Every structure is written in structure tokens, then in C-alpha cells.
Amino acid sequence: MFSVFFLPTTQKGSRSALLGWALWVCLLVALILYGVFGRQLFILSTLGTVFMYVVLTQAWNLLGGYGGYLNFGMVTFFGIGAYTTAILHHYFGLSAFLTAPVAGITAAFAGLLIGIPTLRLRGAYFALVTMIITFAVQILALDLEITQGALGIYMPRLPLTPLGVERLFYFLFLGFAVLVTVLVYAIQHSNIGWALVAIREDEDAAEIVGVRTVEVKWAANALACFIAGVVGALYAQRIAYVEPIGTFAFDTSLNVVLMAVIGGPGTWQGPLIGTPLVLLVADALRVTFTSEVNRVIFSIVVIVIALYIPGGVMGVLQRWRKRRGTSKASTPSNSTS
């Protein structure tokens, strides 16, 4: 049942495929019903955060999972989106809900500018540069007058009860998570998806066979940055406050990478598996250890998974189903005449 749920796309039209998609629909209906009738503030808030991270992880998955570019800078564009909407409200009185698309476009434009030099790098060099850029943008936000420095920017809270606010963002992030997951699924089965996988497997060979690798990477990066920027704008309105240290926290990028790597990079199901797992473990560790120790633990987890479970949970499931199918195919038929 577990494999049917997370691998519904195999054997299209088969009974197991239909059952897998039916289970996903049932889960979505259950989440919608809980959003309507649930009254536990903590659960609504926690699930809203899960949905928000699902969106960020799916966005990271475009270039990081399918393209194989390990990016530790997703929080940079999340923060740019958050600050864009906060600045537009603070100086011009514009609503975050109206400026969310503008925040996404601003983050995408920043992603294009940063991507022009950085996407020519590969491997550890690219990963290191994305980390440096995150800290550089954080320092910039601390120093600039328009961002109000370390004080940050306050935004008016919505005229709703705390339960009403969390219910609103529960549905906003759930809807966005569904939309982005469907988008990633469509890209995975498109020419762009195949091009990204070709880049991940062998970028030089992909160029030789005609894949326009630079343009594909720029497009995937810009789309990922746009999504992160919109999420950042919604997050800013949710907490009604942005400041450099928390908004550009490196832990956010680290969590996103962990969620994708543990769930299964390069699959649309990976973020749906990895996000709740990482958040659950992170909450447990937060009670026991300091944030510095947590970073060390998570870094070790990434290394172990990269070395011994490169496909994450989805990789394990896919290999198990493949072995199961092979064993069934090799079993001699019991029907003899």
C-alpha cells in the first residue's frame, strides 16, 4: 500500500496506479476538510508551515533535484520576496496579497542576475557560492536604510482572530503546494524535465546532443526563484514582520535541501515525503539540542544519505518495486497442461 501511494505513476491505467492517485485525492480532501472544520491552532499552524516548505522544496527540486545543482541559497529569494512585499507596504501602503506576484517577479529577476555568473559553476563551487550569496544578502539587508536595518519592518496584522489567520494561510499554502506540485509533475514529463535530467547525468554530453543547457538552467532557476519569492511574500504577511537574521536564516535553506534529499531529489513525490519527516525531526531535536548542534546533525544526515541512500525514500521505494517486479517476472508460471 505504501509503494502504491507514493508510486502511482507506474503502470499507467493499471489498478495500482488508479488506487495510488485515489489515495492522493483522499488525502487532499481530508486536508481540505480539516482546514474547514479543524479548530486546533497549533495543528493548523504546523500544517501551514509544512505546506509552505513543500512549496519551497518543490521549487528547489527544479534545479537541485532534476538538474543536479546543489543550491544552498533558496532562502535568499524567499527573503527577497518577503522584503519586497514589506517595503511596498511600508512605503506605499500596498497589500501583501496584491504585491505577492511583484515579489515573485523581483526574486526571479534577482535569480536571473545572480544566475548569469553562478550557473556557469558546477559541483561544490556552485554550492559554496550560493551559501556566500545568502550571507552577503543578509548583511546587505542589515546595512541598508530602506530595509530598516536590524530593526526590520513591521506590517499590520490581518483583522482576523489568530485561528482565522492560521486558517487563511493554511489554505493559501495548501493551494500553492498543490499548484506547484502539479507544475513540477508536468515539467518532469516535459522536454524541459528531460533536459534537466540530462544536465544532471552529464552536462557536457547534454550540450553535445543539442541541449541548450545554459538557457534551461536559467529558466529553471528563474521559476524556482519566482515561487520562493511569492512564498516569502505570503510568509511576511503571515507573521507581519521581517528582519534580516530570521528572514535570511541559513537554516531555512538547509532544511529545504534536507527535505528534498531525504524524500527523493528529482521526483515530485520527494518533497511531499521529506518535508514532514524533516520538520518532525527538527522539532524533536530543537527540544534537546542547540541550533548549532542541530546544523551539525543535519549536515551529517545529508552526507550519509548522499553516500548510502542517494535517491532518498523514493529511491528506496523505486528499487524495492523494481526488485519485486523482477522477482515476479522470473517466477515460473504455475499453469501447466
Question: Residue locations for each model-derived region?
Answer:
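Transmembrane alpha-helices and adjacent helix-loop boundaries
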Residues: 1-337
